[in-house]
UniProtKB/Swiss-Prot annotation:
Species for this entry: Human papillomavirus 39
Role played: Minor protein of the capsid that localizes along the inner surface of the virion, within the central cavities beneath the L1 pentamers. Plays a role in capsid stabilization through interaction with the major capsid protein L1. Once the virion enters the host cell, L2 escorts the genomic DNA into the nucleus by promoting escape from the endosomal compartments and traffic through the host Golgi network.
Organism taxonomic ancestry: Viruses, Monodnaviria, Shotokuvirae, Cossaviricota, Papovaviricetes
Protein name (database record): Minor capsid protein L2
Main location: virion
Keywords: Capsid protein, Cytoplasmic inwards viral transport, Disulfide bond, DNA-binding, Host endosome, Host Golgi apparatus, Host nucleus, Host-virus interaction, Late protein, Microtubular inwards viral transport, Phosphoprotein, Viral penetration into host nucleus, Virion, Virus entry into host cell
GO molecular function, one term: DNA binding
Amino acid sequence: MVSHRAARRKRASATDLYRTCKQSGTCPPDVVDKVEGTTLADKILQWTSLGIFLGGLGIGTGTGTGGRTGYIPLGGRPNTVVDVSPARPPVVIEPVGPSEPSIVQLVEDSSVITSGTPVPTFTGTSGFEITSSSTTTPAVLDITPSSGSVQITSTSYTNPAFTDPSLIEVPQTGETSGNIFVSTPTSGTHGYEEIPMEVFATHGTGTEPISSTPTPGISRVAGPRLYSRAHQQVRVSNFDFVTHPSSFVTFDNPAFEPVDTTLTYEAADIAPDPDFLDIVRLHRPALTSRKGTVRFSRLGKKATMVTRRGTQIGAQVHYYHDISSIAPAESIELQPLVHAEPSDASDALFDIYADVDNNTYLDTAFNNTRDSGTTYNTGSLPSVASSASTKYANTTIPFSTSWNMPVNTGPDIALPSTTPQLPLVPSGPIDTTYAITIQGSNYYLLPLLYFFLKKRKRIPYFFSDGYVAV
């Protein structure tokens, strides 16, 4: 019987093994050295390359590539043509010493060029002849102006390199004619033309913003948020917290201590006040009004815990001291100037309330009665008023008596009188019988007030002379 041997399974490549086993740390040493290039051969090449330059030869432990130019066949080296570019001549640099001038001439010096005209030659050996004479006639100059025209030309140039910028000269004008040069005068009275200035494209009221994004009119600054849940509220009853806040944190007593700035301290194990333990910073004070008091507040930060890095961790505490209370506003009770007295009970007996649709009926009736010219001698007759109730309001209208009486609206208010009144004493027994006297002429009933449109009540309400019918 022939035994079959199991086929040997091929091992994975070093690169595949390195990818899978590097993260777990179970790679064989030969795989790690081969992939990372730390084998003995690689180390020998690294040490040798420190003294011998082997660059470009392709020597290594990896796959051979033949270097930069590749492998050369054994038959021989192929012919190569090398292109040689023409060499540029070097530029000669001439150094300039410190004593030599630094002015470089743009045009080189050239020789004298002759125009071809012959140069005159002087003959003779006697030299120059000098003649002297004497004249006794004085020299007289004729200053009479000639009859011809005089032409004067003037040209002015302005060179900014030689002109003082602080001096301003008036520009001059020149002429090349027969007239004498006249410059612009700088003093005296001159004639000028007054041209009024005009404004173009005017629109608006002049209060429009001059920028595309105007600044808002009111900008409010948010106050400190001292009453949030992140701040611990601590009340300080000692008034020294306003003037000397450091006396609550440290035992030092400085000569000068600013009270309107932020104060910084070092964390101490013991504080004069237990509420200020571990305080490292007290912010600047703030004055607020809360619940009717003026409150002085400071926000403090504690350094309860300090990490190794130096970070300070602690709570924020709001210390406050109530300086004074704000008095409530005074409330002044207003008193009525006129006291309305209740009307007499007898006036209520003569009030008649009627439901009408229009006040025109009443106005027509009373105007006709008031315009009558009949007068009566009645002595002291009472003035009876009637209140007519409409759909919209109640109107009080006084009835007309025997004389002409104007119609007044509104309630009657009896003003207080200072005249003393004697008490009324009855002269005899009270009689329950009443005598009603109707005084007037013939009368007639108005049909407009006798019959109503909505409520047909055939009841006469009053007579034409203004007295109540009984």
